[in-house]
């Protein structure tokens, strides 16, 4: 195996005395893991920050072997670690990606979407310009893994207008008229998840994160809830304070 590709750093963990195992999302090969010799050195630690864009080369003699990985920094987002809200968002989105995707499965549109959300975070660290996109990324990831929510029509009546809720069991949208008697048992559906042109305020973002969080915990992160969802809760708490 020899793959040279752009990649987004998603996770790093120490391995051995000085090395690191890095997981990175690539446009054509999906999530790949590799061993970086000296990955915890002063030179490489700033390169292997989650969210950074690198030129990566994976090399392995057999398909079963963990590849060796060398990286060259293409674009650094490490400076955003000084912005608590932006850092929390990058931590969560990269953790979600690393924890959810199987290695070696192509997810080209997820790569493009993650890169776009990270760029939006970089240019608007206050979250006004990227919070809705982060929720949409969560929905896209769920859909790519076979857990798409059906937000196109009311599951009860077939109506396509005034969709206001989502069933926490089926993941189907519910219209306001059909859902109001059961509102306490349903999840609010913010308009920006139905109509991409709709405006969103902080309460809408919180509702969107509550919606995706329910299904991520139930369907995607079942075996990793304690670790991966801690990063998400830090982001939700920070955004909740803005609402």
Curated annotation (Swiss-Prot):
Mention any one GO cellular component term assigned to this protein in its UniProt record.
bacterial nucleoid
Q: Does the keyword S-adenosyl-L-methionine apply?
A: no
What Pfam family does this protein match (any one)? RecO_N
Q: Name one GO biological process term.
A: DNA recombination
Tell me which UniProt keywords the record has, alphabetically.
Answer: DNA damage, DNA recombination, DNA repair
Q: Per the similarity annotation, which family is this?
A: Belongs to the RecO family.
Checking NCBIfam families in the record gives: reco
The task this protein performs is described as: Involved in DNA repair and RecF pathway recombination.
Its name, as the record gives it, is DNA repair protein RecO
